[in-house]
A protein has these predicted regions:
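Bacterial N-terminal signal peptides
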Residues: 5-13
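Cell-envelope and extracellular/periplasmic
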Residues: 18-373
Length: 373
């Protein structure tokens, strides 16, 4: 008994000073945006501790080949940070180790690392988790990012509002099947938001949206957004850096179209102006001209199925070259909507059809982008 107590007492001392290696990048299920059809760069970063004279080595292991160990020089404080170029695809297995005199002193790994396509998804409830049925990833090749961590992209999508279904799992599956690479999403949609609520703080507008949680009235009677949604839009882009994701997918418009109080309805001319402002200002803040897909969105319920004014405003952004043409989700009616066709959100079949419509818009454009590089 005395021997056991002694060993337990000195165990922390024995462990103290043991060589250690850890990874801060990549994280599990992280997707890196590929630069060309054929390759992309993975950031491998971490730190070592209590390893004087030891060599840091890293490698990415694919399903068909192990890959060579690559020596990395650690800074005096023990940090290391490099980029490794590899063929597009995944999942890769990232490994890092400490060696000295032919012996492995410590090692660590990350199981799922992808080089593929990343999309930021923004807008209101039908861009988020408010569909009738939660969707699941079928391919095993789709993940999403919640500001801090990556996860398999099963609904609900962390980072967006709501706790039910979205179109992202089936869209990711469709794109992964088409392009043969992992797909990543950055979900930031907020249910019930007007385009006015996505404006930067300090941009005045004449009348508030129906819900006023994210806006406030100015002394002169006009209104402004609190800027939180815009800040999130910009900060996510900045996290990934210039060309660190492929495009923004914007799905929004219901909360600006045909409101019960007509004074809360946004004229199409202002919708076009405000969304154009959001696109331009977010590009400037992010430091690059991220492509935007803008869907046609204004459907509420049967009998209130479209606003020509809002639809024309959305289409005007395509025609001006400020945005790319997204799907026409107003066309999804009947049993593709929740509650047997009575609601504004999508049913399970509607979410899958919504995903298919997005894939139809994204695929030819993405093929063209990949052919240019």
């Amino acid at each position: 008994m005395r021997l056991l107590s002694f060993l337990l007492a000195i165990a922390p001392l024995l462990l103290e000073g043991a060589p250690q290696i850890s990874l801060t990048s990549p994280t599990d299920y992280e997707v890196f945006q590929r630069q060309t059809r054929y390759e992309g760069r993975v950031r491998i970063a971490g730190s070592v501790k209590d390893a004087p004279g030891a060599q840091v080595e890293v490698r990415l292991v694919g399903s068909k080949r192990k890959g060579e160990w690559r020596p990395v020089e650690a800074a005096a404080q023990g940090a290391f940070d490099i980029f490794v170029t590899k063929p597009s695809g995944g999942w890769y297995h990232c490994e890092a180790r400490l060696t000295k005199d032919g012996q492995t002193l410590a090692e660590t790994s990350v199981a799922h690392v992808g080089i593929g396509e990343i999309f930021l998804v923004a807008g209101q409830s039908n861009s988020a988790n408010h569909g009738e049925e939660k969707q699941q990833v079928r391919s095993g090749m789709v993940s999403s990012f919640d500001r801090l961590n990556w996860h398999p992209a099963d609904d609900p999508q962390r980072g967006a509002s709501g706790n039910s279904g979205s179109f992202m799992p089936p869209l990711g599956d469709a794109l992964a099947a088409k392009f043969g690479v992992p797909i990543g999403f950055i979900p930031i949609g907020i249910g019930a938001t007007s385009v006015r609520e996505w404006l930067p703080a300090g941009v005045p507008f004449p009348a508030p949206p129906t819900l006023v949680y994210r806006v406030s009235q100015l002394p002169d009677g006009r209104w402004e957004s609190n800027g939180v949604a815009f800040t999130t839009l910009v900060s996510r882009q900045q996290q990934f850096g210039p060309r660190g994701f492929r495009a923004v997918l914007w799905h929004q418009g219901e909360s600006d179209a045909n409101q019960k109080d007509p004074t809360r309805t946004l004229p199409g001319s202002l919708y076009q102006e405000y969304l154009g402002r959001i696109i331009r200002d977010s590009r400037h803040a992010a430091g690059w001209d991220a492509p935007w897909f803008v869907a046609q969105v204004s459907y509420h319920v049967p009998g209130d199925e479209a606003s020509a004014d809002i639809r024309d405003a959305q289409a005007a952004l395509w025609k001006k070259g400020l945005a790319l043409e997204g799907p026409d989700s107003d066309a999804l009616k009947g049993d593709l909507r929740e509650r047997g066709g009575k609601g504004v959100h999508f049913s399970g079949p509607g979410l899958r059809e919504h995903a298919a419509r997005w894939a139809e818009r994204i695929t030819p454009w993405l093929e063209q982008q990949l052919d240019q590089k």
